[in-house]
């Protein structure tokens, strides 16, 4: 697969999951940083750890949740070898569970729910932002910003992500 390393395309990482294309990783990171550097970020669907490693260089603390344990174990090992100290990993279902370190300045979700899960919104600090793909067959990239008790939604480009699934895989 190394011969595809410079392609702007999603790549398979096993378990019917993909590493997002580099453009989308950069775009989601750009949106995350648009209004300043968030201190505390929840990443749902950390997969290979690629986006996690980028976030770890840009924010104070990353909480990475992955539902597929072998992917989580592999990314944890790699990021520890690279001496990232500001990432906490958790094996779990980020689509249903409120994270124990909530609330967050930002949440980045790397899988597409059909609609925005309420549990995501509940975990945002005031002025916090949620960046995620939304939709079943046709998906769009969205950013939802919490303004007091209201949520302001912005829609960006059409995207294609794996679906957000419930449950965990050991």
Each language-model region and where it sits:
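N-terminal auxiliary segments of SAM/dcSAM-dependent transferases
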Residues: 1-3
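Substrate-binding/catalytic lobe of Class I Rossmann-like enzymes that use SAM or dcSAM, i.e.
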Residues: 142-148, 152-170
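Conserved nucleotide-cofactor-binding alpha/beta core module
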Residues: 33-152
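Conserved alpha-helix/loop element of class I SAM-dependent methyltransferases that forms part
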Residues: 5-9, 15-40
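Alpha-helical hydrophobic/aromatic positions enriched in membrane-embedded helices and signal peptides
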Residues: 13-14, 58
């Amino acid at each position: 697969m190394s011969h595809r390393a410079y392609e702007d395309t999603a790549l398979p990482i096993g378990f019917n999951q993909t590493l997002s294309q580099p453009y989308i990783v950069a775009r989601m990171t750009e949106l995350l940083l648009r209004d300043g550097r968030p201190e505390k970020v929840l990443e749902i669907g950390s997969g290979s750890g690629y986006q996690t490693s980028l976030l770890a260089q840009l924010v104070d603390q990353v909480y990475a949740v992955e539902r597929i344990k072998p992917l989580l174990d592999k990314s944890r090992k790699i990021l520890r070898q690279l001496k990232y100290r500001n990432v906490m990993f958790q094996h779990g279902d980020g689509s249903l569970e409120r994270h124990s370190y909530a609330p967050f300045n930002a949440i980045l979700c790397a899988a597409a729910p059909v609609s925005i899960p309420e549990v995501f919104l509940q975990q945002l600090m005031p002025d916090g932002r949620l960046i995620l793909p939304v939709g079943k067959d046709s998906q769009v990239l969205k950013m939802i910003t919490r303004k007091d008790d209201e949520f302001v939604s912005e829609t960006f480009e059409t995207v294609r992500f794996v679906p957000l699934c419930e449950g965990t895989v050991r």
